[in-house]
């Protein structure tokens, strides 16, 4: 029985490998813990002159407080350093982070401090 369990585990690992290979190393989860809805999310290669398209453009709703979204990159994308911009739904104010190494970061958690008025990001 142990031989079959080991064979199944190896089979499952081999079958899962192609799916894992399709993930780009820059894929990450964005978590909104700001207390507010976010209406727009943009990425650009670090220090680019323009932002890429709004990542939320195809969605009907805002990125609500407490929600998380997985951002996927095409496997052919090699750039590791990216800038991130979020825009709040309530007043169109924005926050920007530069030079995020998405090859090393898999989760970005956004928080807002009402006393300081600053949005911060925790990179895991």
Predicted regions and their residues:
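Intrinsically disordered, low-complexity segments enriched in small/polar residues
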Residues: 20-78, 85-124
């Amino acid at each position: 029985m142990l031989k079959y369990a080991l064979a199944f585990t190896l089979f499952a690992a081999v079958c899962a490998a192609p799916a894992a290979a399709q993930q780009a190393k820059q894929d990450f989860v964005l978590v909104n813990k700001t207390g507010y809805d976010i209406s727009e999310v943009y990425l650009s290669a670090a220090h680019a002159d323009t932002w890429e398209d709004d990542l939320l453009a195809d969605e009907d709703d805002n990125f609500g407080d407490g929600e998380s979204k997985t951002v996927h990159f095409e496997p052919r994308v090699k750039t590791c350093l990216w800038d991130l911009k979020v825009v709040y739904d309530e007043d169109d104010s924005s926050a920007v982070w530069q030079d995020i190494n998405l090859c090393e970061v898999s989760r970005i958690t956004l928080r807002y401090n009402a006393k300081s008025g600053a949005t911060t990001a925790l990179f895991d």
